[in-house]
Amino acid sequence: MLADMATKVEAAKLLVYKAAMKKNEYAQGKKVSYSMEAAMAKLYAAEVAMEVTTKAVQLHGGYGYIREYDVERMMRDAKITEIYEGTSEVQRMVISGAMLR
């Protein structure tokens, strides 16, 4: 379980780095699109954050729900990322639209 969690977090990081690299290329004047990569990074990172923190809370048992433990706060923070950066459905629409262009 821990290995799967670490692998998903690392994959999410790589998607974020790729989107940032594309955005940087765009900022340097290259004619590249970065909206699909950004949407993929937002979608995957938000979903992985929620999945991994939920598993972390479960691994901690009852202590995972106590406010004194960081894992409880991390799960709350992960939940808001699913909403704040645009819902998963919106990100999927952005990705699909970019693929169809």
Regions found by a protein language model. Name each.
Residues 1-101:
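Alpha-helical interface subdomain recognition
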